[in-house]
Regions:
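Phosphate/dinucleotide-binding and metal-coordinating scaffold of catalytic cores
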Residues: 1-279, 283-377
Length: 377
């Protein structure tokens, strides 16, 4: 290919894939190269695909086939696949999984999609084809465990809708919106978001896709892929924010700005007890000059949380602001700058979280149950 003939200007999309011709093999601990794993569905999308196979097997009077990683990768609808990868069998040929019959639904279908997701969850047989067909195309392309779907806004922009689940202990959508607004108040880089409520089950959190710009696709890669890690990499095996910082220093399009942003995100994660800050929940967008830290996403408060998923320094993941202050220099902040920034973020969260929760209709009881997530410093 031409890009391999011009290796002087080439860049790696995956540390496990070298820039040379010929067959390459995945590491033993990876079913797919991370480059492709980022385009695969996670638990919700895989559940939908497995249910589809079960329905098809029942119709054909056979045993359901065990789906492979390639099935999951190529079963994702092309129009809403994460990032910029597209697949075809031949150069210039039609893209796979691009059937117009499964096009991303419009915004006005949100209520129907939420109803379908709840009905699908509550269907004990797991074989209701009506609900599956509603959800498969818009929901199979997305990661995470929550019921979700891609939808198109009136202006043509692509959004992710995260629906309430029967398994929710609290209104997850509303609390994600609260934390999103807090992050914006703290000056962090966040995508556009909205909250809709269609039922008593809970709220639907909507966030604009940041890997699309009008009709242009922007390549996205998770930190898990770019660090050469596997699912489950965490503080337990020594994975830390310092690893992310090292990657930004070496490969970042805006290293100074992104290092500061990442450091502030650590403080914010502590301030709201976001303990799900694993490597899949940090991402980068490919630019002509390198990798840029993506907008903040998938941040949720956890009232009983006391540790982050990643270490702050090389060996400690405790929710303790003193830890993040100790490593501030590695992210390019002076002692004075880091103390001022941490104080400002924690103060902003403490001063505003209850007011924002009330704004989005969360009850006093719900606020009290979540109080433990918002640390006081």
């Amino acid at each position: 290919p031409q890009w391999l003939q011009e290796c002087d200007g080439a860049y790696s999309l995956d540390p496990d894939l070298a820039l040379y011709r010929g067959r390459q093999y995945t590491p033993l601990d990876k079913p797919l190269f991370g480059l492709f794993s980022d385009s695969c569905p996670d638990r919700w999308g895989r559940l939908l695909m497995r249910r589809r196979e079960a329905i098809q097997a029942r119709k054909e009077d056979r045993k359901p086939r065990k789906l492979t990683e390639s099935d999951f990768l190529l079963g994702v609808f092309d129009g809403s696949r994460m990032g910029a990868l597209r697949f075809s069998l031949e150069e210039g040929g039609p893209f796979l999984s691009n059937d117009p019959a499964f096009a991303t639904p419009p915004w006005v279908k949100l209520r129907t999609l939420e109803h379908a997701s709840l009905a699908f969850e509550n269907d004990d047989s797991g074989l209701n084809e009506q609900w599956l067909q509603q959800l498969l195309a818009p929901g199979s392309s997305l990661g995470g465990a929550r019921p979700k779907a891609s939808v198109l806004a009136a202006d043509g922009s692509l959004w992710i809708a995260k629906f309430p689940s029967k398994n929710d202990e609290y209104n997850s959508g509303a609390w994600e919106m609260v934390v999103h607004e807090l992050a914006k108040l703290c000056g962090l880089h966040v995508p556009e978001a909205k909250l809709e409520t269609f039922s008593k089950t809970g709220s639907t959190f909507l966030v604009k896709r940041f890997d699309r710009k009008v009709s242009q696709r922007i390549h996205f890669a998770s930190a898990m892929t770019l660090l050469g890690k596997t699912d489950g990499a965490s503080a337990a095996d020594g994975t830390s924010y310092l690893d992310l910082a090292s990657f930004i220093r070496s490969n970042g399009a805006n290293p100074t700005e992104d290092l500061r942003e990442l450091w502030k995100r650590i403080v914010f994660n502590m301030a709201v007890s976001n303990t799900d800050d694993h490597l899949r929940n940090h991402g980068f967008l490919l630019t002509p000059t390198g990798w840029a830290l993506s907008p903040l996403y998938d941040v949720n408060p956890v009232p009983e949380g006391n540790c982050l998923s990643l270490n702050v320094n090389e060996e400690d993941n405790s929710i303790d602001i003193s830890l993040v202050l100790e490593v501030a220099g590695y992210f390019g902040l002076t002692e004075q700058e880091s103390e001022a920034a941490a104080t400002e973020i924690c103060h902003t969260v403490q001063e505003n979280w209850e007011k924002i929760a009330q704004k989005y209709g969360l009850s006093r009881g719900a606020v009290e149950r979540m109080r433990g997530a918002f640390i006081e410093e």
